[in-house]
């Protein structure tokens, strides 16, 4: 099983400090610890850099590319930086993602069970009211019918930058 110490959570932010604070608190509350948090601050102007300097968060690495690369650009930048740090897997999320305390533990368990047979893993994304968010909700495809699939793990054909987990060897 992949050890959490070999995982880097990548969080991309731009001028959303209140959301970032909640995201970082949720990462600190994970039941599995020891992973690195790589924060990509896309040149925020809302006090994010000053706030980060005040944090005493073990495993936090902050990178600022000096410009707003956008979401996808920030994730590409973060993945390259995480690979340079030597991690074996990345856990990608926007700054408004609030992972449940057992989210990383569940992803690590799913990776141990299916890691060789899947390209990536993704968490279920819920709105604040508990309803499913459409960005990670799986749909029928011509390749697979998932009607009635009621399990903790669902075959997936798409995901968003809301709790996307993949091995760096991919």
Locations of regions flagged by a protein language model:
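Cell-envelope/extracellular polymer assembly enzymes that use nucleotide-activated donors
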Residues: 6-8, 36
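Short, acidic, metal-binding catalytic loop of nucleotide-sugar glycosyltransferases
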Residues: 25-34
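Short beta-strand/loop segment that forms part of the nucleotide-sugar
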Residues: 35-43, 63-65
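Conserved donor nucleotide-binding strand/loop of the catalytic core
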Residues: 53-73, 81, 85
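Conserved donor NDP-sugar-binding/catalytic core segment of glycosyltransferases
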Residues: 102-134
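A recurrent flexible, glycine/aromatic-enriched loop bordering the glycosyltransferase active site
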Residues: 146-166
């Amino acid at each position: 099983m992949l050890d959490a110490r070999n995982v880097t959570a990548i969080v991309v932010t731009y001028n959303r400090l209140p959301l970032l604070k909640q995201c970082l608190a949720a990462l600190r509350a994970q039941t599995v610890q020891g992973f690195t948090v790589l924060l990509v601050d896309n040149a925020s102007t809302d006090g994010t850099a000053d706030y980060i300097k005040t944090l005493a968060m073990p495993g936090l690495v902050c990178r600022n590319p000096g410009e707003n690369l956008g979401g996808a650009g920030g994730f590409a930048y973060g993945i390259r930086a995480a690979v340079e740090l030597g991690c074996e897997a990345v856990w990608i999320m926007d700054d408004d993602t609030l992972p449940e305390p057992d989210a990383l533990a569940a992803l690590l368990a799913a990776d141990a069970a299916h890691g060789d047979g899947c390209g990536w893993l993704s968490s279920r994304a819920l709105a604040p009211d508990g309803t499913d968010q459409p960005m990670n909700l799986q749909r029928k495809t011509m390749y697979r019918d998932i009607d009635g699939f009621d399990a903790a793990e669902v075959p997936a054909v798409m995901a968003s930058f809301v709790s996307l987990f993949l091995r760096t060897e991919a």
